[in-house]
Amino acid sequence: MPQNKLFIYLTIVIGAIAMGWMVKDLSSASLDEKNKSQNFLESDDSDVENIGELTAIVNPNWVREEPSSSMRIAQFRLPAESKDIEDAELAIFSGIGGSIEDNLNRWFSQFKQPDGSESKSKARVRNFMVGGMTTTIADLTGTFTGGGMPMSESVEKKDYRLLAAIVKGDSSIYYFKLLGPRSTVGLWAEAFGQFIGNLRKVSI
């Protein structure tokens, strides 16, 4: 399925939930992708969790992990379809320095493209509202080359995909970074869209 259609479909899912109505026509997603993800999506066992000042509905098939860095406020492992494929990881940050654009550009720079072009030019970025909060989502594929920190180890992971969402809360900005093999991230793209679309401010 063309990557552009996947991104459009993801934005529809998030936007639909954010506006309080669900997408009924899923024709833009292939039947194969829908069948693979259906068991993951259709569950009454989702957990409601607080993430900073936000409430989130977490898919029950996502595995909560101890954050691997003090910069992360939460971390989840998203299982691959089979054991011979790597899992994906959702890392959630808050209170990190730099603007939204700065951080997105830093994440984009962690990828390189087969044709040698700048990854920033290949990324798809869109803004809209989720639960009254300004939200930016980004989608990029390519060869992942490392964590982006000064002491991080250089890697070469081909055919990787980044799905990112940045949500501006009342007092903090929340960064959601889903990273992994393109097939694994694609498997969870709709669930990620639902997760972001259902984010709300904590009621006081």
Regions found by a protein language model. Give the residues of each.
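N-terminal targeting sequences that direct proteins away from the cytosol to non-cytosolic compartments
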Residues: 1-88, 95-133, 141-163, 167-204
